[in-house]
Amino acid sequence: MASSAFNEAHRTSDPHYRIMKNQKIAVIQLQLNHGPDQNLAKCSQWVEKAAHQGATVICLPELCASHYFCQHEDTQHFDLAEPLGGATFERFSVQAKSLGVVIVAPFFERRMPGIYHNSAYTVDADGSQAGLYRKMHIPDDPQFYEKFYFTPGDLGFRSARTQHGHIGTLICWDQWYPEAARLT
């Protein structure tokens, strides 16, 4: 009993803790096969629609700006990568702030020459970057030639504090490994 009372008092005194009621989470799945500008515009339309339907956390598909291109090994796809703070973050930072929502926006990250990641921003409702996740488990199977493109992530599994709760991000194959869910 005392432990329960202590935990409740501790949680409510934490400025980052609030009781979340009726959170609506939108997971957007759509076909992306155009250039980055068109794909980002299409994703933005769906973010807008989800927010207007009451979603407070909106998750976009893997590699949302570029599309999933890993079915073939082609060096031209490296041209689709962007640095941190690039077009994906810029677009969804403005949109998250405008709509007051959290957006999980996966993208093809160019960390430095020769080092690329399959990454995702967690953009808070004020437009700031609340988190960055780099996919840890990289498959190399027929139609999933990801090791040709991506270096395994080095940021670990952790959650990001946002105005709409703590968000733990995993990308595709990472969800098959139980430690990822336990640690985020």
Identify what each model region corresponds to.
Residues E8-I19:
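Short, Lys/Arg-enriched N-terminal segments with co-localized hydrophobic residues
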Residues K21-I25:
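Extreme N-terminal starter segment of soluble prokaryotic enzymes
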Residues A26-I28, I58, G168-L170:
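Hydrophobic positions in the central parallel beta-sheet of the AAA+
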Residues Q29-H34:
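Short polar catalytic/cofactor-binding loops
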Residues P36, Q45-D126, L132:
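Cys-nucleophile CN-hydrolase/nitrilase-fold catalytic domain and related Cys-dependent amidase chemistry
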Residues Q38-V47, Y177-R182:
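Short, acidic/polar
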Residues E82, V94, R111-T184:
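Active-site catalytic loop in hydrolytic enzyme cores
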